[in-house]
Curated annotation (Swiss-Prot):
Binding sites annotated in the UniProt record for glycerol: R86, E87, Y138, D248, Q249
Regulation of catalytic or functional activity: Inhibited by fructose 1,6-bisphosphate (FBP).
Enzymatic reactions: glycerol + ATP = sn-glycerol 3-phosphate + ADP + H(+)
UniProt keyword list: ATP-binding, Glycerol metabolism, Kinase, Nucleotide-binding, Transferase
Record organism: Streptomyces avermitilis (strain ATCC 31267 / DSM 46492 / JCM 5070 / NBRC 14893 / NCIMB 12804 / NRRL 8165 / MA-4680)
Pathways per UniProt: Polyol metabolism; glycerol degradation via glycerol kinase pathway; sn-glycerol 3-phosphate from glycerol: step 1/1
Organism taxonomic ancestry: Bacteria, Bacillati, Actinomycetota, Actinomycetes, Kitasatosporales
Keyword hit for Nucleotide-binding: yes
Protein's UniProt name: Glycerol kinase 2
Length: 507
């Protein structure tokens, strides 16, 4: 039974494939979890959409499910936090509360031609100084512009103030706090920073970019901090303060207690996202990284990060399993790889659809190099795992070149952190300890922490740091000479992946 004196915080994690609600206690331990998937809609090649109404319905269901599993009443929740898939874009009718079109998902590439046109002679760098981002189809601003130009009559309605724009956090907060009956139309700095419409210095919408993209200011939410009470929930959560919003990767930074300059976390999923806390000033990147918001606590100074995104890490293990059939389950790769001492001279560069950070080479394609008759499937299994470690090393090196900050440890989360061989190799190639926390749900935990800070459940960042607990630590054991030799070979393999795909027109 729940402790009546205990304080509980709920967090909604609205992700690309599913929505979850996790309830945490005051110690940061998980009390209950509920999760539901939603549909992926693919109207055309390269197009990916979600039904925002379905997402809201699933979010309501997982909140109810988590509360029921915890044996709690809604009035026992001290706060509600939100974390979300970043960049996914919703436009809705303020009067009816209904979306005017399916949400355009971050993976969707329909705005590639529009981005190419917007870039003009400056190319991808046109808005980088103001936003920290390259002009690319991932980000929300071009998605909103596309909707305004392609849904009949929408632009005129938007200019009259009838339409609301938001990333998923805004859509959820608006609905949670009343929707058409007084719902709050807000976003936080981490999500606004991924629209390519917010100025990183002022933390306000940049009117010159709005003008260039032809997005009317009337549709935009108010930009707020990541940790403050935006409003009070109605409905099943009636009276609960809605008190945080963070993009998913920034929420993981917060949940991993990366509050000091130089602290970093890497989330290992289908791909990987490595974020480094660079403090209260944005650090521009000359090495293929994104300059992004980390978080902002109430009226305190904002914290910025450098972000390196790696397209293929866990997905390479899936390919090894599903396309090659060498293993039957993802977990088998560790046993197979551990049966040999090294990669036998083989390297696999998983540039299946190009390389992300730090190269951003859309012409790259996957290669296997260094093959001899000595190489076995076990060596290839090891090369699959090592590809993740080496790609992470390249991002860490780029972060040092941009910021001058050397990481001293790397905090890790995500499914691949269960693989001890991979985590040991990661520590070896970075030359620093790699640490996995006891609570693995760092994204939800970060949203809960930020909401609890805003409502007095926790007092300050020092208290949150004291809750963070280590589960496993891997320390480097590789000689520097071996590390340097292997890294040199990896870099040679990467060069072999360039120039394979010749594009017709705009990618």
């Amino acid at each position: 039974m729940p402790d009546n004196a205990q304080k509980y915080v709920a967090a909604i994690d609205q992700g690309t494939t599913s929505s979850r609600c996790i309830i945490f206690d005051h110690g940061g331990a998980i009390v209950a979890v509920d999760q539901r998937e939603h549909r992926q809609i693919f109207p055309k090649p390269g197009w990916v959409e979600h039904d925002a109404t379905e997402i809201w319905s699933k979010v309501q269901a997982v909140v109810a499910g988590a509360i029921a599993k915890a044996g709690l009443r809604a009035d026992q929740l001290s706060a509600l936090g939100i974390t979300n898939q970043r960049e996914t874009t919703v436009l809705w009718d303020r009067a009816t509360g209904k979306p005017v079109h399916n949400a355009i998902v971050w993976q969707d590439t329909r705005t590639s031609a529009l981005c190419h046109e917007l870039g003009g002679s400056d190319g991808q760098d046109r808005f980088r100084e103001q936003t920290g981002l390259p002009l690319a189809s991932y980000f929300s601003g071009p998605k909103a512009a596309w909707l305004l130009d392609n849904v009949p009559g929408l632009r005129a309605r938007a200019e009259r103030g009838e339409i609301a724009f938001g990333t998923i956090d805004s859509w959820l907060i608006w609905n949670l706090t009343g929707g058409t009956d007084g719902g709050r139309h807000v976003t936080d700095v981490t999500n606004a920073g991924r629209t390519m419409l917010m100025n990183l210095e002022t933390l306000q919408w940049d009117r010159s970019i709005l003008s260039a993209m032809n997005v009317p200011e009337a549709v935009l939410p108010e930009i707020r901090s990541s940790s403050e009470v935006y409003g009070t929930a109605v409905g099943q959560l009636s009276g609960v303060p809605v008190a945080s919003a963070l993009g998913d990767q920034q929420a993981a930074v917060f949940g991993q207690a990366c509050y000091d300059v130089g602290t970093a976390k890497n989330t290992y999923g289908t791909g990987s996202f490595l974020l480094l806390n660079t403090g209260n000033r944005p650090v521009p990147s000359k090495n293929g990284l994104l300059t992004t918001m980390g978080y902002k606590i109430g009226g305190e100074a904002p914290v910025y990060c450098l972000e390196g995104s790696i397209a293929i890490t866990g997905a390479l293990v899936q390919w090894f399993r599903d396309q090659l059939g060498i293993i039957r389950t993802a977990d088998e790769i560790e046993t197979l790889a551990a049966s040999v001492d090294d990669n036998g001279g083989a390297y696999i560069v998983p540039a299946f659809s190009g390389l992300f950070a730090p190269y951003w080479r859309s012409d790259a394609r996957g290669v296997v190099t260094g093959l001899t008759r000595y190489v076995t499937k076990a060596h290839l299994a090891r090369a699959v795992l090592e590809a993740t470690s080496w790609q992470t090393r390249e991002v860490v090196d780029a972060m040092y070149q941009d910021s001058g900050v050397r990481i001293t440890t790397l905090k890790v989360d995500g499914g691949m952190t269960k693989n001890n061989l991979l985590m040991q190799h990661q520590a070896d190639v970075l030359g620093v300890p790699v640490i996995r926390p006891r609570v693995s749900e760092t994204t939800c935990l970060g949203a809960a922490y930020a909401a609890g800070l805003a409502t007095g459940v926790w007092n300050d960042l020092d208290e949150l740091k004291s809750h963070w607990q280590k589960d496993v630590e891997w320390t480097p054991s590789m000689e520097a000479s071996e590390r340097d030799r292997e890294y040199h070979n990896w870099r040679k393999a990467v060069e072999k992946s360039f120039g394979w795909h010749e594009e017709d027109g705009v990618n």
